[in-house]
């Protein structure tokens, strides 16, 4: 059934609809297309750069905290003592870095530990695709959510701007190049 439904024609129409919604071109000259809704993140890579053919990834990014303390221990994310240590690190304003392979749960960990940030601490999130959703998962807390945009407002710009807003916390969704330098200097 799925092979009959997901035809080349369907994939082309789906891609064009996404491109139209975000007002972007998708072709050999513009081979990557990204879009998001309140709960989904869509990435499409053109067949001119993906040798296996057009690639589509649809990821759920709900504005909820899915991980609980009980689940973290029961599903062997970490031992209870380690979890308590990490929660206390957040409560005591320690710097933390979450790294790992794509899809491993870095954003879910950030969302989980963010609930332990003290109520009055100003938090600034800096993301290219809004996935942390701090304001939604931590209602009533002081938060500024920034979105970076290639060529207009990059991570380095966002970090510089956020420092003028007197944050207690800066959360970056990605740190790959010069933004690491700016973050460490802040």
Region locations from a protein language model:
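Switch/coupling sub-region of P-loop NTPases
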Residues: 93-99, 112-186
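Walker A (P-loop) phosphate-binding loop of P-loop NTPases
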Residues: 103
